[in-house]
Regions:
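N-terminal non-catalytic structural scaffold regions of very large proteins
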Residues: 1-210
């Protein structure tokens, strides 16, 4: 079959899985040479195939090209630093209005300097509201432990010297993971910036499982 060279985007129209979930794909057709396909599976792992042969994690392709897993994370994701504050038992980070583009509700947010609650739990807040807070001088904030749930590590975190003593890039944070990190006396985390609109964690979870 002959097709014009180019990059083609498509999905399976929900026919692959019983849930009807749309599985997106991309095909790269060069002027000469092998076709390269990228596709998601139902678990949102990202794969590639050459000439429609066996699918392999997309991160494997990048690793073969000389990237490290950290370099892949740095290339495709921005990151934010969170530091645990033993006094308040909350996590300190920079206030970034961009984080509120993808949601209109919020966790509790405290001004790290004044210790004033500037956003109450469950308050509706959007980018414009967040931008106003930043313009009014809000820089560093404290957020609860629960606010980190569902976020993903941007760098490996080694908690001990055992074979499974490292939480790797792409590990999803939950209460148990955070507690093990704190028990190892590690109080600073680098976390990838993801959202539900245009920066999903799919490549991070692919890296983790590669």
């Amino acid at each position: 079959m002959h097709r014009s060279p180019g990059v083609f985007f498509d999905h399976d129209k929900g026919k692959t899985h019983a849930s009807g979930k749309l599985l997106f794909n991309c095909r790269v057709i060069p002027n000469r040479g092998s076709w390269l396909d990228f596709e998601y599976d139902v678990k949102d792992f990202l794969y590639f195939k050459i000439d429609r042969k066996k699918k392999i994690f997309a991160s494997t392709l990048l690793l073969a090209l000389g990237f490290t897993k950290l370099e892949i994370a740095d290339e495709f994701y921005e990151s934010e630093q969170f530091t645990f504050d033993p006094k308040t038992e909350k996590w300190k980070t920079k206030f970034n209005p961009e984080n509120y583009k993808a949601k209109n509700f919020s966790e509790e947010v405290t001004n790290a300097k004044t210790e004033e609650v500037v956003i109450k739990l469950g308050d509706k807040i959007n980018f414009l509201n967040a931008k106003k807070l930043a313009n009014d001088g809000l820089k560093d904030i404290l957020v609860t432990r629960e606010s980190l749930f569902g976020k993903f590590l941007h760098r490996d975190v080694k908690i001990n010297d055992e074979a499974e003593g490292t939480f790797s890039i792409g590990t999803e944070l939950n209460d148990a993971v955070i507690q093990q990190i704190l028990d190892a006396n590690i109080h600073t985390l680098q976390i990838s910036v993801t959202n539900s609109i245009n920066k999903g964690p799919y490549l991070l979870t692919t890296i983790l499982n590669d």
